[in-house]
């Protein structure tokens, strides 16, 4: 079994319960708008962290715009999503760009989305911080039970937290 924590749009602040959840996972994926690179130091997954540059991360030169992760049963494509529609990234455009992925992860909207209507799946963890989190910090957890069984769970945490 492999566990992947997925977050985005932290803007320098990550909810403490999300940090705990991420650090219990094998992999962590951050879909951009990190803003303060130092905030990533709190994320210590068991194996590896992957992060991409968001539209508010132009100053973070260590990150690329697109990443991918190969896991048993498929590939995960990761990008911030803002180049596929500024207000609401197009799932059709993302699927056309990454047709061979099993899952496409994007951020940008700060809204949690799990779109499994077509292949590849398109998911957005929502905002894991305080900025435009629509009432609560959010993230996703992907559990790979086997090559055929991938389970995505939405996670929602109380908005009241101090950093």
Regions found by a protein language model. Name each.
Residues 1-47, 57-68, 73, 135-138, ...:
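N-terminal active-site segment of His-dependent metallophosphoesterases
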Residues 6-8, 28-33, 50-55, 78-80, ...:
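Active-site neighborhood of phospho(di)ester-bond hydrolases with catalytic His/Asp-centered motifs
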Residues 16, 88-93:
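An amphipathic, basic-hydrophobic alpha-helix
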Residues 43-45, 71, 96-99, 117:
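Short, conserved loop/helix-junction motifs that constitute active-site signature segments
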Residues 50-88, 100:
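Helix-adjacent hinge/juxtasegments
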Residues 71-72, 99, 123-163:
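Binuclear metal-dependent phosphoesterase catalytic core
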Residues 91-98, 112:
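Non-DNA-binding regulatory cores of transcription-related proteins
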């Amino acid at each position: 079994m492999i566990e992947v924590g997925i977050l985005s749009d932290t803007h320098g602040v990550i909810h403490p319960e999300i940090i705990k959840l991420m650090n219990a996972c094998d992999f962590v994926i951050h879909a951009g708008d990190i803003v303060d690179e130092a905030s990533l130091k709190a994320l210590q997954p068991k194996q590896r962290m992957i992060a991409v540059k968001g539209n508010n991360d132009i100053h973070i030169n260590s990150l690329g715009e697109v990443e991918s992760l190969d896991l048993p049963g498929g590939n995960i494509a990761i990008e911030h999503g803002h180049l596929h529609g500024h207000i609401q990234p197009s799932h059709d455009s993302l699927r056309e760009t990454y047709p061979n992925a099993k899952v496409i992860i994007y951020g940008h909207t700060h809204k949690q989305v799990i779109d499994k209507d077509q292949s590849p799946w398109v998911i957005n963890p929502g905002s894991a911080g305080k900025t435009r989190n629509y009432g609560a910090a959010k993230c996703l957890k992907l559990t790979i039970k086997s090559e055929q069984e991938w389970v995505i769970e939405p996670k929602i945490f109380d908005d009241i937290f101090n950093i």
